[in-house]
A protein has these predicted regions:
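Membrane transport/envelope proteins' first extracytoplasmic loop
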Residues: 3-275
């Protein structure tokens, strides 16, 4: 009897152990599948970054300079090898004066924004999508429409992200104040091709043309301005060619003090987050 009881208890323990082991195996399989899935997703995202590197960076190469622009020698050297689009960025306050119904005074609303001024070649890669669906160059005043007498109408338009409209309580067609300049909101930014390459952002984007930005009066000695130059190679460049071009630029101007990025690493911060 004691032997039978011992055998019966042993079989019961064995059955319970097998059930527990099955649960362990199931958990192990789920863990392996989860790790494999995350790895595959990470590889897909990194591959997407590499394939869209030109659009994300805005060029094959980019140059960033603080507090100064390219000098004549640097610009001439680069223009012989690349198509160039220049832009500059700074943070600024934007204000809107909106008259409320039955109010004696206007209600002042303001917001901190990421201000970006672009030239007529922007963007070299990708598409700047806005609403309404008009040519962004016209919306920014980079291509001025002609009046009846044949003269160009100077229009320093502003393109803004939707969140700024909500913050200021305005809509397309209203006017915003940036620095000492007033700018009509001519469109809403739906997609900015090189937005991811800029890294950390603390406010909505506002796009102006370079002449309009100077009209704002914000660009003064000591202003914290980041000057960017997107470069599109005249001939196709491989990954090795990009690295060689970067070395060539630094050797040609060793004291330039610029930061150069390649399309293969268009957004380092995003890549680190994914990996």
């Amino acid at each position: 009897m004691q032997i039978r009881l011992a055998v019966r208890l042993a079989f019961r323990e064995l059955k319970g152990g097998i059930r527990g082991f099955r649960i362990f195996l199931a958990c192990l399989a789920l863990g392996v599948m989860a790790i494999a899935g995350v790895g595959s997703l990470s590889e897909a995202l990194v591959s997407g970054l590499n394939s869209k590197g030109q659009s994300i960076l805005g060029g094959d190469l980019s140059i960033t300079m603080m507090h100064r622009t390219l000098n004549a020698d640097e610009e001439k050297w680069l223009q012989a090898r690349y198509d160039i689009s220049s832009s500059n960025e700074m943070r600024s306050m934007v204000r809107s004066s909106q008259a409320e119904e039955n109010a004696e005074t206007d209600q002042m609303r303001h917001a901190l924004v990421e201000l970006k001024a672009v030239d007529s070649f922007y963007p070299l890669y990708g598409t700047l999508r806005i609403k309404p669906a008009i040519d962004p160059r016209v919306a920014l005043g980079l291509q001025q429409p002609k009046s009846a007498d044949g003269n160009e109408n100077v229009n320093y338009g502003a393109l803004v992200e939707p969140t700024l409209l909500e913050t200021l309580g305005i809509e397309v067609g209203d006017t915003i104040k940036i620095g000492s300049g007033f700018f009509p909101v001519t469109g809403v930014i739906l997609s900015e091709p090189d937005r991811l390459s800029g890294g950390f952002s603390i406010g909505p984007r506002v796009l102006l043309n370079e002449a309009g930005a100077r009209h704002s009066g914000l660009y003064q000695p000591g202003s914290f301005v980041e000057n960017n130059y997107r470069l599109r190679s005249i001939i196709p460049l491989s990954e090795g060619d990009l690295k060689a071009a970067k070395v060539e630029m630094n050797e040609a101007f060793p004291d330039a003090g610029w930061q150069i990025k390649e399309r293969t690493d268009a957004s380092p911060s995003l890549r680190r987050s994914i990996e």
